[in-house]
Amino acid sequence: VEDFNWDSLFDSAAWFHITGITPALSPSAAELSLHAAKTAKKKGVTVSCDLNFRKKLWNYGKTAPQVMEELVQHVDVAIANEEDCQKSLGIEADMEVTSGSLEVEKYRELASTVLKKYPNLEKIAITMREAITADHNNWSAVLYNGKDFFTSRKYQVTHIVDRVGGGDSFAAGLIYGLNRLASDQEALEFATATSCLKHSIPGDLALVSVQEVEHLLQGDGSGRVQR
């Protein structure tokens, strides 16, 4: 922690994003993650966190909830799926994720429970993946801001090329949307469409442009990345 001038690091920042992978790596990484989030909040920077639970990484003596429950107390925007809420925050998710059909109302209840437990949170976005087959998923998301509950368009993603990076691309799209678009609904739709397109791209990164995402949002459901 002492190796950095934390105040100066956030002097010109407006948004700080972290994922649950970083504090899972080691005790020092967990300490740095918490300190960074606290400092960002103190400096008036918006903090977002993709909970992103990875069981195999938590092997240094602390469980994910022991670390993440404190970290999330310094977060404004949480991003998760139902497993992240359960495994990182200890909040039971009452839904059957392997059924191929998810109930939106269950996600409304889950989002409400998270915000009640963490009143510091301004919003939570939760992704919803209905696995029909290995290469055919229905993909959508919800967002709750403590007052209004939003649901995105549901995409039928067929012939999936690579699911890796789907969550990261959703987070990136949401951050873009919350900073650039007029409403939470628009931000959620942009995030879901960005992640939908990522399923057609091999590798970790969503190499798509804003224009390509907008094409999909405007009704171009071809699923093709424009090149």
Can you annotate each of these PLM segments?
Residues 1-150, 154-157, 212-215, 221, ...:
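Ribokinase/PfkB-type carbohydrate-kinase core domain
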Residues 134, 150-220, 227:
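Conserved post-catalytic alpha-helical subdomain immediately downstream of the catalytic base
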